[in-house]
Amino acid sequence: MHKRKVIVDTNALLIPGTFGIDIYEELEDMGYLEIIIPESVMEELNALRNSESEKGRTKRAAQIGYQLVLQHLQLANGRSRVVIERKGGDTDRDRDTDSEIIRMAKMQDAAVLTSDAELRRRLHQEGLSTVFLRGRNRLVAD
């Protein structure tokens, strides 16, 4: 059976702490059984939660998002599997996280969960599926 995969962008990991939505449960309910978090996304999330300049809601949402990733990595009892994907053989240090996400989505035939309008536009240009927050209370796929 083909596992439906979804790659998660940094801003999507802020959804639980900002809107109180369990993205893992929502993704499972949508049939995504493999949730992939790029290493570069974890680095961005870690930088947000440890940033001296980041204050308030964003920093708190980043801390919640980071803890939930760690919690779901350790929980193997759900229907879905959460993995952190290491950077591939690409040695281009200038490759940005969005380009890395697009490359991974193409290679793994995966959808992408993001709230970034520009990334969604680029994904659609490549013919890739996206999942996004609609109405501040649910995830939808297009």
Language model features with spans:
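Glycine-rich, phosphate-binding/catalytic loops in enzymes
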Residues: 23-26, 129-131
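RNA substrate-binding interface of SAM-dependent RNA methyltransferases
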Residues: 35, 40-41
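Nuclease catalytic cores that cleave nucleic-acid phosphodiester bonds
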Residues: 4, 41-142
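Metal-dependent nucleic-acid phosphoesterase active-site entry motif
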Residues: 1-24, 37
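Short, conserved loop/helix-junction motifs that constitute active-site signature segments
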Residues: 27-31
